Amino acid sequence: MSAIPNASNTSASTSFDAHRPLTLADINDPSTKHVIVGMSGGVDSSVSAVLLQQAGFMVEGLFMKNWEEDDGTEYCTAMDDLADAQAVCDKIGIKLHTANFAMEYWDRVFEHFLAEYKAGRTPNPDILCNKEIKFKAFLDYALTLGADYIATGHYTRRSVNYKNNDGIEVAQLLRGLDNNKDQSYFLHAVGGDKLAKTLFPVGELKKPVVRQIAEEHDLITANKKDSTGICFIGERRFKDFLQQYLPAQKGDIVTDDGITIGTHDGLMYYTLGQRGGIGIGGVKDRPEEPWFVLAKDLDNNRLIVGQGHEHAMMLSNELQAYKLDWVDVLPPADIFSEDGLRCMAKSRYRQPDQACTVFANNENGSEVRVVFDEPQRAVTPGQSAVFYIDEVCLGGGVIASIDAPCGI
């Protein structure tokens, strides 16, 4: 495995084998291994079940219901998704279990989601859902059913198992081979000890190939549209959903030089860098250029806006992150050094890798300071900063704050 210039070894980098991608062929005696696939009713989990079955594993499926809502509403697709999952399992001849994790989801994911928005931050519930539900509640339940592994349809990979410096058997999280679909960003908070019990059958495939396999097996999900957005919101407007749970307080929209030019509907509805949906028309004595959200003034309930895609108030050189989850379970040793850990980072999904240096802010590595080589645009508190060396995802944490904006 090649290293980026000046990249340092981490506690997870115990050997080359620790980074070698695991394939289904690496697992001995698959006919004796019981795998339960998280069946979402989509094409990716459907094909995952097919690939595991073809590789000789004992395969069963499990459909999770994580959100309680009237199944007859236009927004809830749970019944249709369950029907599709059942149809796929019937087609390939495997059993489908069902489990309701709605209580766990509310307690561990949704309440945090609401608290973050109330505090003016922009959370990513999918990351917490993976950590707390799909790779904790689901994994624990599957183990009670006698599973040796769980499997999901995520476009990511993991390494062969190895023991970290504390003797815990773990696996590394690796990027999926389809760069356009790689989901390692969303799985960075899943511990390596959980990954060691997980298989990602489609992680080495590209999406068109996955759909082709589904078509070849005449699966009902072959041409099913990919789900997008936050799972419990569905296709409804985000603002309509959120106002059911959090009362909104209108306030002033203020320019970067202090001029009030409008009224916002509630700070929680806006995110840094946002362009559309602000509700600003033509402004006297201002150029006909787009307006962007630059900041939220929580104390005064003001939305700060300005013009210019690269406005100085949207650019920052550093961020502070907390609630760090390290895939290796142990933090990389170099974050405690004077020079820090050289690596790449993403502060949002699909962002190109950004070179940076990571320094620990406390003794256990659960809080860090990240210094970027180049200024970053619209780094958003509540989102996650995720760290990589080559194809290996080291982990990440929640963005707490950024430094003083560049040039201000």
Curated annotation (Swiss-Prot):
GO terms for cellular component: cytoplasm. Its main location: cytoplasm. SUPFAM superfamilies: Adenine nucleotide alpha hydrolases-like (SSF52402). InterPro entries: MnmA-like, MnmA-like_C, MnmA-like_central, MnmA-like_central_sf, Rossmann-like_a/b/a_fold. Its EC number is 2.8.1.13. It is found in: Cytoplasm. CDD domains: MnmA_TRMU-like (cd01998). The record marks H154, Q383 as: Interaction with tRNA. The keyword Cytoplasm applies. Catalyzes the 2-thiolation of uridine at the wobble position (U34) of tRNA, leading to the formation of s(2)U34. PANTHER family: MITOCHONDRIAL TRNA-SPECIFIC 2-THIOURIDYLASE 1, TRNA 5-METHYLAMINOMETHYL-2-THIOURIDYLATE -METHYLTRANSFERASE. This is tRNA-specific 2-thiouridylase MnmA. It comes from Psychrobacter cryohalolentis (strain ATCC BAA-1226 / DSM 17306 / VKM B-2378 / K5). The lineage of its organism: Bacteria, Pseudomonadati, Pseudomonadota, Gammaproteobacteria, Moraxellales.
